[in-house]
Amino acid sequence: MERVDTFKEGKVYLVYDAEHHRMAVEKRLQGNFRIYEQLQALSHSYLPQLYAVSYTEDETIVWEEYITGKSLEQIPATEKQVTKWLFELCDVLRFLHQHHILHRDIKPSNLLLGSDGHIRLIDFDAAREEKEQAEMDTRLLGTRGYAPPEQYGFAQTDERADIYALGVTARELLGKAAKKRRWKHILKKCTALEPKKRYHHIWQITWAIRFGQIRHRLLYPLVFTGLALVTGFAVWGYATDTDVRGAM
């Protein structure tokens, strides 16, 4: 057993599962993290598989799939690659939200690129079940800079908290491309300080990105065609004017 990380809530080990002949991740978390029981019952292509969850008096022990791959923060990427990752992130978040689970700690370091070329969303230590009646979160977790204001105890979080973190993550991964017109509105709306000014559902972001792609593909050919026509008419007009003057 090899310890690979230590953090405030617990420790992470890389272990060998002799029974199934595979490497696995063992997480020992201080406290009761019942959210992992819900996650164990779910299956999605962009989530690591949870093998088992157990509890002691003061610990939650999780055994999950070991993903061989780098985090997205370690991978230089093109705008096209980042767009693909964002579609996949939207897909897995929509799945989680349909099951009333909020991740609450979305950031590039919690997104791994698997050997199959697809992302995996990891680290659900800050996750919780969405509760409509609650006024504020009971456990204030998340990463500063990625978590929205309401996640620090100002109000109860809902899926718009994940939308905020998705926006910050997208801006970081896109780099200079984030300043392009097609991204500016999307990222601004995702990261609005007031939850009511953000997108309310993940599918709206998927649609906005897709619409931006379509508009980009249609608009630029039209612009270039228009410029070509204007240039053509200008050249034709100049040539005609020259011919007329020559005839005179």
Role assignments for model-derived ranges:
Residues 136-150:
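Conserved activation segment of eukaryotic-like protein kinases, specifically the C-terminal portion
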Residues 162:
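Conserved catalytic-loop aspartate of Hanks-type protein kinases
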